[in-house]
Amino acid sequence: MTTAPAEHGRATAVPRLAPAAVFLQGLADQDFATVGGALAADAHLRALLPKGLREWSGAEAIGGQFAHWFGDTEDFELVEATAGQVGGRLQLRWRLRLRAGRLGAGWFTVEQQAYADADASGRLVRLDLVCTGYRPEVGDGRRHD
């Protein structure tokens, strides 16, 4: 995972990225309790998915949704993750490769990008996310749109 401190490298930028780092590490480890633990109890997720806009409220519901998306896999790999700041908001991006029977045969890649706000306790309270959906990897004989 890479992080890009804001404020031109000032030491104060790193603690602001800590909530993003905890969230991304939980995701990398497929530890959805840690993902949920990075969120405030009243957190809200708004996600633009291939099937449309969806919303979830509460750390438990949001953590459960990430478990639904990225749990129950035969193989799982965090390819890339970054965290930074844009206009005072946290910016998180991750790309995953996974194989899961529920998706069909072969490897799939998915990338998500989120902008988030943290509360004074360092937990994420709001995430606005966009997702590519599960994309079959090139060379697996499938048609790609």
Predicted features along the sequence, with ranges:
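Soluble or luminal CAZymes and related metallo-dependent hydrolases
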Residues: 15, 19, 61, 108
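A solvent-exposed, acidic/Ser-Thr-rich amphipathic alpha-helical stretch
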Residues: 34, 38-87
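Hydrophobic alpha-helical core bundles mediating ligand binding, dimerization, or RNAP-core interactions
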Residues: 20, 27, 39, 62, ...
